[in-house]
Amino acid sequence: MRGTEHLELCRLIALLFLSFLLNGFAYSQRYPNHEVNKLLDVGIEYVLNQNYELARLKFRLLDKKYPQLPFGKIYLAVVDITKAFDYGEEIKSEAISESLDEALELSEKLLKNNPIDIWNHYFVALSKGYKSYLKVLNDEWISAISSGLSSVNYFEDCLEMDSTFYESYVALGTYKFWKSRKLEFLEWLPFFDDESEKGIEYLELALAKTSYNRNLAVVSLIWIYIESKNFYRAIAIAENELKKNPINRTLKWALARAYEDVDLRKAIQIYDDLLNSYKSIPDQNHFQEITLKHIIAQQYVKIGEKREALRLCDEILTDNRLTEVVRDKLSDRIKRVRKMNKELIE
């Protein structure tokens, strides 16, 4: 994959992996409390449809009514991370870490008091998984994988207690694949075990065996198939899922990327839809607009439509709405846009 885009996809994959883990108990394994399930179902639906403020209200209510459970604190972290990533905003790592520390403390207390309850193992796994993810946000991949091992162990505990706890397959499958890909430079070592294929097997199993969870685990599979250059499988999964969540930007972005290696004009069309979606967001920082315009310009160059690519470069370079913080985050991309612009006019 291409430099910066590769890094962005890796970060997105990590986000999808860890945020999707939190929805794993639905339908196949539901927490034994109707009101808790209802609040979670509604809040999760708001997240999937990018209604972040409404989702936050539901999870705050959940945390207020059930302070002894870590669900509310974990899901409030999910909302903050997902919204920040979707909008291209800075992630408030310190506040999120504090919330997850509280969730982990609750989870470990529950586990200590009742170690035979599978949910208590699951709570610890989720809390530790998200703490590991904060390292991913800072591109600390080795450290993230190392600390993530503890989370993985708890997911494995869930499977030992109940082999039909398919949500653990989602977590373990995603972990096994990306651990293998991120550490493949260590493959010469005797202890290195490439489990990427096993990871795909686990995810396909979860896809076939779960209901609500398949709408979540599927995105991890899409990016894995893109990474594995199995673009048609990625497209098939994404298009099927978009029938259920047609406005979901995460799915659209994955689908567009898959089409880049199959049908560039189709990819441009989907990226344009995404661009229009971001333009409609009030009071946004325009980070994703700039990112998408650059990506679309790159696709136009590939198909020889240099005039359209130049138009987009000009729009990026003359955009005066960006704050200093956003411009700094986009500095590398803007340099590449300037280079592209120069090459197009020569």
Describe the function of each predicted region.
Residues T82-K92, Y133-L134, K179-F185, L264-Q269, ...:
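Alpha-helical linker/edge segments of TPR/alpha-solenoid repeat scaffolds
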Residues L69, D117, F165, N213-R214, ...:
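Residue-level recognition of tetratricopeptide repeat
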Residues V152, F191-I200, D272-N276, K306-L322:
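TPR/TPR-like (Sel1-like) alpha-helical repeat modules
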Residues L310-E346:
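Terminal, low-structured helical/coil segments at or just beyond the last alpha-helical repeat
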